[in-house]
């Protein structure tokens, strides 16, 4: 399993695929599958049966996962996509933006 540089809560932009250019917050990262769920991106229709929680049932829009390689982190300082580096500060590893050299 490789070390992923994108975490839940990061703001990312889709750089490839049908939703290219869309931005959103990472809701969940699946490390074993190299996929992530991004808020408002890659919406799919799920058909749900009536239940106690949803007595009506019907069709519900829900986010599906997207490949990690198709998203890039947005630098909070420059608001552009950036690559992520890891360096040691003191005795902790921290992520930093390669464009602005700012700790994320």
From Swiss-Prot:
Give the keywords, sorted: Ribonucleoprotein, Ribosomal protein, RNA-binding, rRNA-binding
- Which biological process annotations from GO are given for this protein? translation
InterPro entries this protein is in? KOW, Rib_uL2_dom2, Ribosomal_uL24, Ribosomal_uL24_CS, Ribosomal_uL24_KOW, Translation_prot_SH3-like_sf
Instruction: Write one Pfam family the protein is assigned to.
Output: ribosomal_L24
Query: Can you list the GO cellular component terms from the UniProt entry?
Result: ribonucleoprotein complex; ribosome
The highest taxon in the source lineage is: Bacteria
Which SMART domains does its entry note? KOW
Which GO molecular function, any one, fits this protein according to its record?
structural constituent of ribosome
Entry-linked NCBIfam families = rplX_bact
Summary of the function given for this chain in its UniProt record? One of two assembly initiator proteins, it binds directly to the 5'-end of the 23S rRNA, where it nucleates assembly of the 50S subunit.
How does the annotation summarize its subunit structure?
Part of the 50S ribosomal subunit.
Q: Which family does it belong to?
A: Belongs to the universal ribosomal protein uL24 family.
Question: What is the protein name for this chain?
Answer: Large ribosomal subunit protein uL24
Q: Which organism does this sequence originate in? A: Flavobacterium johnsoniae (strain ATCC 17061 / DSM 2064 / JCM 8514 / BCRC 14874 / CCUG 350202 / NBRC 14942 / NCIMB 11054 / UW101) (Cytophaga johnsonae)
């Amino acid at each position: 399993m490789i070390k992923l540089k994108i975490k839940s809560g990061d703001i990312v932009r889709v750089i490839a695929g049908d939703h290219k250019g869309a931005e959103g917050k990472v809701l969940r990262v699946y490390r074993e599958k190299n996929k992530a769920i991004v808020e408002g991106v890659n919406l799919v229709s799920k058909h749900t049966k009536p239940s106690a929680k949803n007595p009506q049932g019907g069709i519900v829009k829900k986010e599906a996962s997207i490949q990690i390689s198709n998203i890039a982190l947005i630098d909070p300082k420059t608001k552009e996509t950036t690559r992520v580096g890891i360096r040691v500060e003191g005795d902790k590893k921290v992520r930093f933006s390669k464009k602005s050299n700012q700790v994320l």
